[in-house]
Amino acid sequence: IGFGRLTVRALVGLGCAAVLGWMALAIYYSPLQPAWLRAGLSALVPVGAAVALLLVRPLRWVLAGILGAFLVVLAAWLAIPPSNQRDWQPEVAVLPYADLHGDSITVHNVRNFAYRSETDFTPAYYAKTFDLRKLDRVDLIAVYWMGPAVAHVFLSFGFAGGDHLAVSIETRKEKGEGYSTLKGFFKQYELFYVVADERDVIR
């Protein structure tokens, strides 16, 4: 086998492994019930592919089967809807909204918690009207975690007179729910637009 053909086969093999891995995880973290069925179908992905590689010829039929299965799982994954009806953690329980009237915007449910610690706080919200003609600055703020290589960034809009309004896109977690980066790749969390007093998000 020439070097070029060997390289192509290696790339195809790596691509298939990546696709199979994604499919297995997408099924495992899907909302499919019961849980044992989800786990079984997830395990069936690599096992079925291995059996097909051993028994099915020509190999292009195996590749076609993997592609077909991938498209089915991808379509199901894309169809998973977000939900607004869950028992949310208090930090992300109240949705903000706004009314726009000409050059004025009234923002409701601006978060302004009184924090005693990261987990001990008193929820508080207010509504405020901003004159968009007085918007004079936009700050990009980075909050670093896991060292200097990873940061959460958000925007703070500054208005003449000293008013600031921060907007941060965050994970909307349920009560008792932790965070997993891996699960985050598979639609396990809704997203939430935190609209807050700048002092709420910069502490």
List each model region and its residues.
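Alpha-helical hydrophobic membrane-insertion segments
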Residues: 3, 7-10, 40, 68, ...
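Juxtamembrane/interfacial segments around transmembrane helices
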Residues: 65-67, 91-94, 110-126
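Alpha-helical transmembrane signal-anchor/signal-peptide segments
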Residues: 82-101
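Internal/C-terminal transmembrane anchor helices
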Residues: 59-82
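Membrane-embedded alpha-helical segments of integral membrane proteins
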Residues: 8-52
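Membrane-helix interface "capping/anchor" motifs
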Residues: 3-6, 53-64
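Juxtamembrane extramembrane loops of integral membrane proteins
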Residues: 103-104, 110
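Glycine-rich catalytic cores of cysteine/serine-nucleophile enzymes that process amide/ester linkages
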Residues: 105, 116-203
